[in-house]
Amino acid sequence: MAISIKGVNTGVIRKSNNFIALALKIKEPRNKESLFFMSVMELRDLLIALESRLHQKHKLDAAARLQYEQARDKVIKKMAENIPEILVDELKNADINRRVNTLELTDNQGENLTFVLTLHDGSKCELVVNELQIEMLARAIIHAINNAEMRELALRITSPLDFLPLYDVDCQQNGNLEYDTYSQPEWKHNLFDHYLAVLYRFKDESGKEQFSG
């Protein structure tokens, strides 16, 4: 059965200065609670999908944008009234089987985003996020990381959300080109509708000009 969101809470599990996981606790409409633990990569995947939908909302005309924002604010207020409690013991004795190994956006149509979470024990959970809940969910994730005084991590996982790297190339001194490719799942490709190539020039430590792209 799909998990819908009534309220969310987040907390960071860390060891010394090292980020281990983000705890994401969800209160469902019938007050059942589900707890997941997400690594940096899965958080980035989630945020990329959320940011893509927010980008669509930013392109609305003024009247539609106002209508969306008013509806969003009502939902955010309701979510704030239904924040589930995260117990210290749930963080200290985190169940590894609740760790999210992979996250996939399987439905991006309509008002809801549907994700399939594959957990450490091999089980799968379907998580449904309404577009009016996106900002509250994203805010809760970033707030938890900042609250753990890991602002560099917050910047790292939020900065590359508006593009998807596919290739890079270095121009070698002998004139050859050295390519690297980045394999991305199809659902990420589907979030973007145009491609850009960037070529830049820089000087290396010896002062020689180099080219990359």
How does the language model describe each region?
Residues 156-169:
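Intrinsically disordered, low-complexity charged/polar segments
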Residues 1-20, 75-117, 168-208:
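Intrinsic, low-complexity N-terminal interaction/targeting segments
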Residues 29, 86-88, 120, 164:
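A near-ubiquitous, low-amplitude feature marking generic local secondary-structure context
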Residues 14-21, 25-67, 113-157, 204-213:
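Extended intrinsically disordered, low-complexity coil regions enriched in Ser, Thr, Gly, Ala
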Residues 51-87, 160-162:
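Charged surface patches that recognize polyanionic ligands
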